[in-house]
Swiss-Prot record:
UDP-N-acetyl-alpha-D-glucosamine binds at R94, R123, P124, I125, D126, Q127, D307, I329. Gene3D superfamilies: Enolpyruvate transferase domain. Phosphoenolpyruvate binds at K24, N25. The modification 2-(S-cysteinyl)pyruvic acid O-phosphothioketal is found at C118. GO terms for biological process: cell division; cell wall organization; peptidoglycan biosynthetic process; regulation of cell shape; UDP-N-acetylgalactosamine biosynthetic process. It is found in: Cytoplasm. Belongs to the EPSP synthase family. MurA subfamily. PANTHER family: UDP-N-ACETYLGLUCOSAMINE 1-CARBOXYVINYLTRANSFERASE (PTHR43783), UDP-N-ACETYLGLUCOSAMINE 1-CARBOXYVINYLTRANSFERASE 2 (PTHR43783:SF2). The gene is murA2. It comes from the Bacteria. The active site is at C118 (proton donor). This is UDP-N-acetylglucosamine 1-carboxyvinyltransferase 2.
Amino acid sequence: MAQEVIKIRGGRTLNGEVNISGAKNSAVAIIPATLLAQGHVKLEGLPQISDVKTLVSLLEDLNIKASLNGMELEVDTTEIQNAALPNNKVESLRASYYMMGAMLGRFKKCVIGLPGGCPLGPRPIDQHIKGFKALGAEIDESSTTSMKIEAKELKGAHIFLDMVSVGATINIMLAAVYATGQTVIENAAKEPEVVDVANFLTSMGANIKGAGTSTIKINGVKELHGSEYQVIPDRIEAGTYMCIAAACGENVILNNIVPKHVETLTAKFSELGVNVDVRDERIRINNNAPYQFVDIKTLVYPGFATDLQQPITPLLFMANGPSFVTDTIYPERFKHVEELKRMGANIEVDEGTATIKPSTLHGAEVYASDLRAGACLIIAGLIAEGVTTIYNVKHIYRGYTDIVEHLKALGADIWTETV
């Protein structure tokens, strides 16, 4: 069966500007949240990625009128109807689990296929289920392909998450906005995307306090009205392009950035010795290799993002000594390592820590196992000698708007082929 691949001839120096898209991890929660509205919602600044299109299609399966035009989505929930959501769409992306919280909040029941997405090792949704049960829901998990969630009534509850989880924090918020009384989420995730979803819900009339802290309080309301809302910029896309610019940029400017959201990466760049100039909503970066070797440990926000440990890895081949990367969030998130070895990388993984030594990369055929691994391989291809061919590019398109076109515009020798 024919498939698209990305090909890169490495060694080009990049120059120019990139406008960063809206945040994927906000958009994939805010789109399901629109079904909580009574009426019309308009979203602006959405990333143009496949996950967004899939979620819009799921809204349409609930008889919601949804019109996606570039970065704008208009939604009309006037004729909404509850329905079992098909497994083939749901299993294509993990963020479909936000339909659970939103549908539970709106209808008090939902039947939904089990969520998919990137295979990153164990990623249970037990904290989501714990939250739903605390609000009064009963969960039927007897099926191997779908889940039934139902509540006679949703009542506010005090919920302590056993681990910090962005998905669980948001999903509980979605279910709790229509619950009777107050819901308190302790040990809540503090990520900017959590704040963005809370701000969107508040713009529709929800009563939410404390988003961005470890304690979020939601006072249930009877109705949410329509709203117009602009999604925040994508800090992971911004971080990825920062890594690209540091790897092979001469003068690259990134626009539409919230500097505070990427300050952990900016600080790590200072350790590495990357030239970074931050101004308001734009960042200018250029390659200043060889870099200093560093240690990186992923943590929950505001720590170093797990989504950036793969994209920053190719930079570490350009350092003057061995670097160490430990992923405490997803210890199995190292499927990119074997692919980098095909390119001649001197890299080993032991018990959740990668040891990365200075290496000269050469072009090879490699496979993107997940979204951020794909970004890592693109950066590796940009600095490698010769031509790199990347397979499984569907993962890359799930999270990056027009990445091939953006890189071409910067001067990269990159193209797609059908093989």
